[in-house]
A protein has these predicted regions:
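Soluble, acidic/polar mature domains that operate outside membranes
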Residues: 1-295
Length: 295
């Protein structure tokens, strides 16, 4: 489902939402490329003006079936069938009911994995929309407190940031806000793949609960957003949001245990933030000295 952010404003760009096989915000870069490649398809050669013999060209059961619906309700169906050789594919459409070929490289954006079409961030939460976050990371409990209003800088004096009740407004020797670094790790959890047939029924191993502020714009009350993780195998975890399976999973290492510098998992990142709080001098922690290894 592709729709303009504001149908009355052509300059507003496009907002993309997928409804099948999963309901997710779309990746605007990939889907813009997909849409442009479809709209700009041009025939290399005309093969048959009679489009009744679809089976001969692999178009009766096409590799790809693309349905475009305009804002006025007009529908165009595009079928992409067998290879025609020479780097081309057979194509037909309801807009031009004939058999033609198109260049295969014009269809690059059509043949991508599902992960490329979706917004891969599990829950990208703006910091000013959140009042607190409860973390249960494999049994390790933490509580984040946030007092940031839209338009404020995280370094403003009136902003309060806490980890388990401690002042967490710690900066590095270069001025980097270490709470902000941790928060980016928290909201930066990314989808690793899809398992649409799964029905996770194992125990929840980790949980992230965001408490969201009331939103006057949408007239919504304060509410909780609960993200839960259930082990899929030794390497990945299913993701549930507000108790419902999302259809996707994440890398356990990337999400929780990675010690790679700049790509730390949550268990490592929260330990580093606590270490910085414990060893900061006048609110400054020298990250160049490093952190202790996390066992």
């Amino acid at each position: 489902n592709l729709q303009p952010s504001d149908p009355a404003d052509e300059a507003a760009g496009l907002a993309f939402n997928l409804t099948q096989p999963v309901a997710r915000p779309g990746n605007p870069d990939t889907l813009t490329s997909l849409l442009n490649s479809i709209l700009n398809l041009s025939a290399v050669r005309m093969v048959d003006l009679d489009a009744s013999n679809l089976e001969r060209y692999g178009l009766a059961q096409p590799k790809y079936l693309l349905e475009l619906v305009t804002l006025t309700g007009k529908e165009v169906l595009i079928r992409i069938g067998d290879s025609a050789g020479n780097g081309q594919y057979y194509v037909t459409s309801t807009a031009l009911p004939a058999i033609m070929t198109v260049q295969a490289d014009a269809l690059t954006a059509v043949d991508l994995p599902l992960t490329d079409y979706v917004d891969r961030f599990v829950a990208l939460m703006s910091i000013w929309k959140v009042s607190s976050v409860s973390l249960d990371l494999e049994g390790e409990q933490h509580e984040l407190g946030l007092s940031v209003e839209e338009g404020q800088k995280i370094t403003d004096e009136t902003v309060e940031l806490t980890l388990d009740g401690q002042d967490a407004k710690i900066i590095s020797q270069s001025g980097e806000n270490l709470f902000s670094t941790f928060y980016q790790t928290l909201i930066g959890i990314r989808i690793d793949g899809f398992d649409l047939a799964a029905s996770p029924d194992g125990p929840v191993t980790s949980r992230i609960t965001y408490t969201l502020k009331p939103d006057p714009a949408s007239q919504s009350d304060a509410k909780a957003l609960v993200i839960e993780f259930v082990s899929r195998d030794a390497y990945t975890d299913y993701v549930l949001i507000d108790g419902s399976y999302t259809g996707f999973y994440v890398s356990h290492r990337d999400t929780f245990t990675s010690g790679q510098v700049g790509q730390e998992g949550l268990l490592v990142a929260v330990s580093q933030l606590q270490y910085a709080i414990d060893h900061a001098v006048d609110g400054v922690f020298d990250t160049s000295k490093g952190y202790p290894a996390i066992s």
